[in-house]
Every structure is written in structure tokens, then in C-alpha cells.
Design a protein with these regions (language model features):
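A juxtamembrane structural motif centered on a specific transmembrane helix
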Residues: 1-3, 28, 134
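N-terminal membrane topogenic signal
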Residues: 1-17, 155
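Helix-boundary and loop/linker segments of multi-pass membrane transporters
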Residues: 5-7, 151, 155-156, 280-283
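Hydrophobic alpha-helical transmembrane segments of multi-pass inner membrane proteins, especially
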Residues: 18, 39-251, 293-327
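Alpha-helical transmembrane segments of multi-pass membrane proteins
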Residues: 19-33
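Juxtamembrane/transmembrane-helix boundary motifs at the membrane-water interface
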Residues: 34-38
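Short hydrophobic, aromatic-rich alpha-helical segments embedded in or entering the lipid bilayer
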Residues: 237-240, 254-260, 286-289
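Long extracytoplasmic/lumenal interhelical loops at the membrane interface
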Residues: 260-302, 319-322
Length: 327
């Protein structure tokens, strides 16, 4: 019996997504409106652009829902997408100006996009396509089906070279935050490919151990020496702020320290939506990476925990769906 398309809609994933998106729009307006009014510009400017991206996300969801799965499995299709993404990444690195010390943004008629964000989706799509075609080999040969007993692949068309190439472009932005997320995404996709879980545990242990050694090495070597390494000079100050943001309140630690102040102001129940103190100019770029500190300041620990709970629901239902499909 042929199932109707609506049977494939998972409302347990869709509803938390919609709620989080609407909450995000409210928070963006709350975070940006006051400062916009002070500057004499429209308080709705940021929420309009974010609203457009929200609508585009719904259009994308509808497109993926309507498109035939076989089309997504075509090598030519994903190949064209990867080529287009590579061009966007290279343009954002070598043609555009820096934003807060790093490249990575492209502007089109008043809108800015960050190609590295789209790479996260493309990477999942690409690895899912590669691993889905190796399922019989994985069942028979485990992880060897992915590596062919070559830790350094000899074939330039090997999927590992493609992943390393794409992540390397992000690293030279430099954008180590997104590069780390892409590396973790690759690790998760490998673990979900069907290989024995002991290999995932080993990879995770190596990753955690390597990250710990790297952080302590940077601390021992010193941030100044680390900053002389090509590409990584940009992140040197961030490591310094990570260790103690209050040592340099006027420069590298300013944003992080003020995010701590914002969270401290919030307490259990917050100052109330729209009543943040730090967003009045004390916390730079409050609507970007540090927006959650404003959420805690306005909604408190309880409100922020409810939002995190929605993220957990979204993750758990998504992971449950993955397990169901594997079985």
C-alpha cells in the first residue's frame, strides 16, 4: 500500500522547530530594537531580515518535502551544490572584507549570508549519500568499508579528502568555531553510518583528548607565541579571553565579560522581556553569538531552561527518528 506524503511529516520535530523559530524572532526584536531606536533607525530592521530567512527556511522545508528522494541521491545534483558552495566559500574568504577580524560573509542587496552555515547542511547531505551506498560493505567489513584500510586515502576522489578540503576552507577564514562544528558533524555522521559503536567511542575519546591537549598546550606556550602561527593569529585573543575575560575588559575580554554580567543580572526569573541592561550597548553585537546571555538576562534561568528543553526535544526526537530508520 502506498503511503500518502503526509504520513512522513513528523510533527514532534516540526512543532518544536516552529516554536523555536518564533521565539528566535521575538528575542531578536527584543535584543536589537532599543539600540536601533537610539541610533535613529527602524527597530524592525533586523527582525524583517530574520523574518525573510525564516520564510525561506519554510520554503526550503516544503521543497525538500516535495522533492523526490531519488533526486537527492543523484551524484550530479550534490556535485553541483558542492561546487556552488565552494565558490561561495572562496569568494567570502578572498574577496570580501573582514567582519570582527574574520572573513566569511557575503552581502547581496542589504542581506548578508555566511556560506559556512550552509555547508553544515550540505556536509550532512553528502556524507549521508556516501554512507548510504556503502551499507552492504559496512555490514560486512565494519569501519574498513569507509577507510579501505587506508588511513591516508590514495584516491583523491575519496570522501575524506572532500570533507577535509571543505573544512580547510572554513579554517582559513579563519572560522574555527564553524570548522569545529563541521568536524563534530562528520564524527556524528560516521557514528550513524552503521559502524560498530566502539569505533565512535574511540574517535570521541581521541577528539576530546586532543582538544584538551591543544588547549593546555596553548596555555603553556602562551597566547602571544600562538598568535604568530599563520591563520591562528585571529583566535589568539579569543583563547586569552576564554581563560580569563576579566584580564582585558577593554579589548578581547569585553564581550565575554559583559555576557557574564548579563547572565548574572537575570537570576532565576529574569528582568522581563525587553528589559535587558547589557543590550543597551554594553554587550557588543548582542543579537549574534552572545544572544543567549540576553535571553538569560531577560527570561532568567527558568525561561532559558525551557528554551533549552525545546532544543532537547528537537534533538531527541530527531535522534529517535534516526534509530527508527536504522532498524
Amino acid at each position: 500500500m502506498k503511503l500518502e506524503k503526509r504520513h512522513f511529516l513528523n510533527y514532534s520535530i516540526l512543532i518544536p522547530y516552529l516554536l523555536l523559530s518564533i521565539l528566535g524572532l521575538i528575542i531578536v526584536y527584543s535584543t536589537t530594537s532599543a539600540l536601533a531606536i537610539q541610533k535613529g533607525v527602524s527597530p524592525f530592521g533586523m527582525i524583517k531580515s530574520q523574518g525573510i530567512f525564516f520564510v525561506l527556511s519554510l520554503v526550503t522545508i516544503l521543497f525538500i518535502y516535495k522533492v523526490k528522494l531519488n533526486n537527492l541521491k543523484k551524484k550530479a545534483f550534490i556535485g553541483i551544490v558542492i561546487i556552488a558552495e565552494t565558490i561561495l566559500l572562496l569568494l567570502s574568504r578572498f574577496i570580501t572584507d573582514t567582519v570582527n577580524g574574520a572573513h566569511g560573509w557575503l552581502s547581496f542587496g542589504g542581506f548578508s549570508i555566511q556560506p559556512a552555515e550552509y555547508l553544515k547542511i550540505i556536509l550532512v547531505w553528502y556524507l549521508a549519500l556516501v554512507f548510504s551506498k556503502k551499507q552492504e560493505e559496512i555490514q560486512q567489513y565494519d569501519y574498513q568499508a569507509l577507510t579501505h584500510n587506508q588511513w591516508i586515502p590514495r584516491d583523491l576522489a575519496d570522501w575524506r579528502w572532500m570533507v577535509l578540503f571543505l573544512i580547510a576552507i572554513v579554517v582559513i577564514m579563519p572560522d574555527l568555531g564553524n570548522a569545529t562544528i563541521l568536524a563534530l558533524t562528520t564524527l556524528i555522521m560516521i557514528s550513524a553510518s552503521g559502524i560498530a559503536y566502539r569505533w565512535f567511542s574511540s574517535l570521541l575519546a581521541i577528539l576530546v583528548g586532543g582538544s584538551t591537549v591543544l588547549l593546555y598546550s596553548i596555555k603553556l606556550i602562551g597566547v602571544e607565541r600562538f598568535s604568530k602561527i599563520p591563520v591562528f593569529g585571529y583566535v589568539a585573543k579569543r583563547f586569552s579571553a576564554f581563560y580569563n575575560p576579566f584580564n582585558d575588559l577593554s579589548d578581547s575580554g569585553h564581550q565575554l565579560a559583559n555576557s557574564y554580567y548579563a547572565m548574572s543580572n537575570g537570576g532565576w526569573f529574569g528582568l522581563g522581556l525587553g528589559n535587558s541592561i547589557e543590550k543597551q550597548g554594553y554587550l557588543p553585537e548582542a543579537h549574534t553569538d552572545f544572544v543567549f546571555s540576553i535571553v538569560i538576562e531577560e527570561l532568567g534561568f527558568v525561561g532559558a531552561s525551557l528554551i533549552l528543553a525545546l532544543f532537547c526535544v528537537l534533538f531527541l526526537w530527531g535522534y529517535g527518528q534516526e534509530i527508527h530508520l536504522i532498524r
